[in-house]
Amino acid sequence: HSLHILFADSIISIAERFQKIKNFQLLKAGGYMKTITREKYLERMIELNGTQDIKIITGIRRSGKSKLMQAYMEYLKSHFENINIIFIDFMDLAYEDIKEYHALHTYVEEHYRAGKTNYLFVDEVQMCPKFELAINSLYAKDKYDIYVTGSNAFLLSADLATLFTGRYIEIHVFPFSFREYCRYNEDIQDKDKLFDEYSIKGGLAGSYAYRTEKDRTNYIKEVYENIVTRDLIQKYALPDTLVLQRLSEFLMDNISNLTSSNKISQLLTANDTPTNHVTIGRYIKYLCNAFVFYDVKRYDIRGKKYLENSEKFYLCDSGIRYAAVSYTHLRAHETC
């Protein structure tokens, strides 16, 4: 058992930890770099430091998964000396030659350093076909502390148990919360104003780099469309993108309203998008698997059981709603 559990950080206060993190969430805003610490997620990774589990960072596109990984590596470098960090970013052409699971395995083994605590970080792991074979083999060697991130379409919560044979822990990253948005805009004290802004801009922090509403909206819309029209279509080989798009728009236009697959299929069919409740039920599951929507089931207090015939759905980020659905339409709908 060569993986050492590090205890030294337990005596360091949380405040001291975060003060030493210099590069947590870097964002270019108005021509300068602004930082914000996302304590909830970083603290979770610190808690899991040295455990045998594979740590899998999941979340919607552009929610900050890669930045979280980078921040944690900075934390390790600033707190421990006898460590060896093996970092692979498959978005970087420098790692093009190891986008094959045998090559990935060999590369990691070649960079292992005996006598040190070895950390393995793999960003955008899905770009290496059959990556799970390499990760599972490295996990079985019991000498690496492993962390991976990937596209939401390839690291779905429902698929993790199938992909990884060893123990794993999912660290789910959301877009900025309203609290984080306030901290990002700490120079503005009017919380009502900030809340109105946040309800429209949302928490996809990459959009804050743009000065105009049009550019911000285009950024968010592109993130959303990549998930719906590319990730899910590719993941599930869907034959009809129109039904998926109309379904997503319907759910966004009916946030927190009770609905069902039967009702949705009837409404879409009546509006020239023929479908059925089985397809709708399956597509809703796909959207939830990709972290675009979250479902809340009705609960029968008397019977103490969940009711299957109707649910409520909530969007992962309010900014997507305003970007994907006509802003004018939403305002008119909300004032009716």
Walk through the language-model features, giving the residues of each:
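Hydrophobic anchor at the beta1->P-loop junction of P-loop NTPases
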Residues: 57
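Short glycine-rich substrate-engagement loop in P-loop NTPases that contacts/grips substrate
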Residues: 88-112
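Pre-Walker A adenine-sensing motif
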Residues: 37-49
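Structural recognition of the conserved hydrophobic beta-strand(s) that form the central parallel beta-sheet
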Residues: 145-151
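Accessory nucleic acid-recognition modules appended to NTPase machines
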Residues: 221-331
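Walker A/P-loop
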Residues: 66
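Interdomain motor-coupling "hinge/lid" segment immediately C-terminal to the ATP-binding subdomain
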Residues: 153, 158-257
